[in-house]
Amino acid sequence: MNIHEYQGKEILRKYNVPVPRGIPAFSVEEALKAAETLGGPVWVVKAQIHAGGRGKGGGVKVAKSMDEVKTYASNILGMTLVTHQTGPEGKKVNRLLIEEGADIKKELYVSLVVDRVSQKVALMASSEGGMDIEEVAAHTPEKIHTLIVDPQIGLQDAEADDIARKIGVPDASVPQARQALQGLYKAFWETDASLAEINPLILTGDGKVIALDAKFNFDSNALFRHPEIVAYRDLDEEDANEIEASKFDLAYISLDGNIGCLVNGAGLAMATMDTIKLFGGEPANFLDVGGGATTEKVTEAFKLMLKNPGLKAILVNIFGGIMRCDVIAEGVIAASKAVSLSVPLVVRMKGTNEDLGKKMLADSGLPIIAADTMEEAAQKVVAAAAGK
């Protein structure tokens, strides 16, 4: 789950990480009121969407008068902001953050992620913060410093101080940087975040260390113990189909292809998509029905896939371990009839009650294309999607 910048800053504030004063706004009138409350002479009008690259996309503007606040708020609110993270379709801006201006002397970068190799937390920091951190990572990776933090110990004072000095924080400001780094780490750990990023973390002219931006991603599997994080959820920023899928406990992610995939198990789902691509096809979605699929869940899964106007074929790939193949067959038959399926359907089933499931499909009278192996299934669905 992702949240907005201003929400991330609320979290940072709770963990004693210095952030600028700011007020969210949902209208031009609220933006003007926020600017008046903050006082001038400089404000920053920032689009709030779940994507980076807002500055380059025209979603962040510095205003030096109330008239400029009004102009920028009017221009940004309601615009479709296209960045390198939104894709060409962009995201509509429904809210703003009006923030006090800052005296920026130096922009730094710091982030925390889970390092799967070490099974610990990786702290990454750079002296080259700001809008072009992707360029730094691509062309001068030596400027990015990485520290592996043992979660049983946490980020120690000496480690934080060392990282701060490596990214160019002057000695007089190192204690402030330590506070910011340790606060960010604590926020990351205690909220079950999968990513916590400050870009930029700035040094001001008078030596202060301030988080000028904040980005958090959270482990969705841990949200049950964080109602305060769930309260930040903005459904306008999420894919409508993914929201609908979550109501039926389906793991669904929209993709750009034309072949629908219905699979049980995330690993098998990814392998299925890889195999489709291997034979020249493009998956339209990731869809994991899990180990407890019912007729209702399978029907809803079909409905979700068929909402895609570009869908040309569907592949159902099931391994019957916990999930019995006859139950899936029953669901596929019922779903096909319920939605009046009009695209080719390829089904491959292996495992518990496999023969019974296959017989049910064969006797259903539906034009289902059977396959025995994953390779055969992928080849058949790619051909069907191409009209062959």
Swiss-Prot record:
Binding positions for ATP per the UniProt entry: K46, G53, R54, G55, E99, A102, E107
One Pfam entry name: ATP-grasp_2
Pathway(s) annotated for this protein in UniProt: Carbohydrate metabolism; tricarboxylic acid cycle; succinate from succinyl-CoA (ligase route): step 1/1
GO cellular component, one term: cytosol
Cofactor remark from the record: Binds 1 Mg(2+) ion per subunit.
Function: Succinyl-CoA synthetase functions in the citric acid cycle (TCA), coupling the hydrolysis of succinyl-CoA to the synthesis of either ATP or GTP and thus represents the only step of substrate-level phosphorylation in the TCA. The beta subunit provides nucleotide specificity of the enzyme and binds the substrate succinate, while the binding sites for coenzyme A and phosphate are found in the alpha subunit.
Subunit architecture: Heterotetramer of two alpha and two beta subunits.
PANTHER family: SUCCINATE--COA LIGASE [GDP-FORMING] SUBUNIT BETA, MITOCHONDRIAL, SUCCINYL-COA SYNTHETASE BETA CHAIN
HAMAP family: Succ_CoA_beta (MF_00558)
Protein name: Succinate--CoA ligase [ADP-forming] subunit beta
Source species of the chain: Ralstonia nicotianae (strain ATCC BAA-1114 / GMI1000) (Ralstonia solanacearum)
